[in-house]
């Protein structure tokens, strides 16, 4: 399979990703917060998940904290790991879940840690897939 075909496949898998992220502060004010995905669908974000995030994020950071929380799945030497590149997202996960494995400024999670986060943030987090073409 050539790189162009593989890139198109990954893009198709990630079509659920948001067209544009929204701030925690903005979404907390809404009765029924939603995010529009690249595929055109509107996805409802559960209010209780936003409130859970707000409990672990400094209120001054709410306008800068973007929803959804992006969990980037990568394959490293045959092992799948999750990267959290956004610094505010990483700090939130550290406070809320106790995961603190930061390498080169990126929070790194193992697959067995993902379900704990996804159970609590079913609608407010999104897993994206990345592949290294090296």
Curated annotation (Swiss-Prot):
InterPro entries: UPF0216. It comes from the Archaea. Belongs to the UPF0216 family. This is UPF0216 protein AF_0460.
